[in-house]
Amino acid sequence: QXGDLVAAGKKVYRQCHACHSVGEGAKNRVGPEQNNLFGRVAGSLPDFRYSKAMKSAGENGLVWTDKSLHEYLKNPRAYVPKTKMIFAGLKKPEDIDAVVAYLKTFDTDGMPDPDASTYTPPNG
């Protein structure tokens, strides 16, 4: 169920919260804020200092989608070599599915996205 997946994602996202924020009033921290992430070109928030690697990835066509975020969260440094993100990655596919579902619930202003209730993980 999408609601259960989102609730699980909120718990898993606690690992991300030290560096990132999401939701109403989200601000850039060590990592960029993550409202309205899906469809965003990687490295494109104007007021965040990205690594050269992340900016280059975006310039070369990396856009955050369900699939690209799944791959990135598995192993950030393998997906975007030389990224500044120090997190090693999420090992469990179900945790990645949950975080993706959770992040999809936030629109540009950090408010609930009505389309998020239709999210189905690519793995099932």
Swiss-Prot record:
Post-translational modification: Binds 1 heme c group covalently per subunit.
Listed SUPFAM superfamilies: Cytochrome c
MF terms in GO: electron transfer activity; heme binding; metal ion binding
InterPro entries recorded: Cyt_c-like_dom, Cyt_c-like_dom_sf, Cyt_c_1A/1B
Domain of life: Bacteria
Modified residue annotations for Pyrrolidone carboxylic acid: Q1
Protein location: Periplasm
Entry GO terms, CC: periplasmic space
Signal peptide (from-to): none
A Gene Ontology biological process term: photosynthesis
Keywords: Electron transport, Heme, Iron, Metal-binding, Periplasm, Photosynthesis, Pyrrolidone carboxylic acid, Transport
Residues reported to bind heme c: C16, C19, H20, M85
Main function: Cytochrome c2 is found mainly in purple, non-sulfur, photosynthetic bacteria where it functions as the electron donor to the oxidized bacteriochlorophyll in the photophosphorylation pathway. However, it may also have a role in the respiratory chain and is found in some non-photosynthetic bacteria.
Similarity comment text for this entry: Belongs to the cytochrome c family.
Protein name: Cytochrome c2
Organism: Afifella marina
Lineage of origin: Bacteria, Pseudomonadati, Pseudomonadota, Alphaproteobacteria, Hyphomicrobiales
